[in-house]
């Protein structure tokens, strides 16, 4: 049986990760235009880098919740499970899911500032080393940025999600 699971912030909130829109969410402490847009990156890449470094450190302390584990268990029982998530964390993968499509990017990955969706520029940060610094460069020589789909950017994984 093929099962498609769509998840969002509520799943990761159960693991203790901060959400963006809750009453005490991240958007209450940060202006979305400052940390989640190409324009914010152009104005202050250090602020954006620090913001996502903090998100990565938070993720390193988190563990998959029961929901993540139940989805992975379906796969272990032999079902074809495709997870389509709006979350940028890797908690589905940590729980054991192997077919995860991240619509909005992946927090533990970085990419080129000039060509953020070029597969040759995307890399995974080393385990246990979540921080990126100004001066850390992508293969094309540009500043590394988070591999996150920011507001105003196209969602490259939307076509595969529809399939």
Regions found by a protein language model. Give the residues of each.
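Conserved catalytic core of sirtuin-type NAD+-dependent deacylases
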Residues: 1-163
């Amino acid at each position: 049986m093929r099962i498609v699971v769509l998840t969002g912030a509520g799943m990761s909130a159960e693991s203790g990760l901060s959400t963006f829109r809750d009453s005490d969410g991240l958007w209450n402490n940060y202006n979305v235009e400052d940390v989640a847009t190409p324009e914010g990156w152009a104005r202050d890449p250090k602020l954006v880098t620090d913001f996502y470094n903090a998100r990565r450190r938070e993720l390193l302390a988190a563990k998959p919740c029961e929901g993540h584990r139940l989805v992975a268990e379906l796969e272990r029982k032999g079902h074809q499970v495709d997870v389509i998530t709006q979350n940028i964390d890797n908690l589905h993968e940590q729980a054991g899911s192997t077919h995860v499509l991240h619509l909005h990017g992946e927090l533990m990955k970085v990419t080129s500032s000039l060509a953020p969706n070029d597969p040759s520029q995307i890399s995974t940060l080393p385990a246990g080393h979540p921080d990126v610094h100004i001066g850390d460069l992508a293969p094309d020589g540009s500043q590394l940025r988070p591999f996150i789909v920011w507001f105003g950017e196209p969602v490259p994984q939307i076509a595969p999600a529809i399939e």
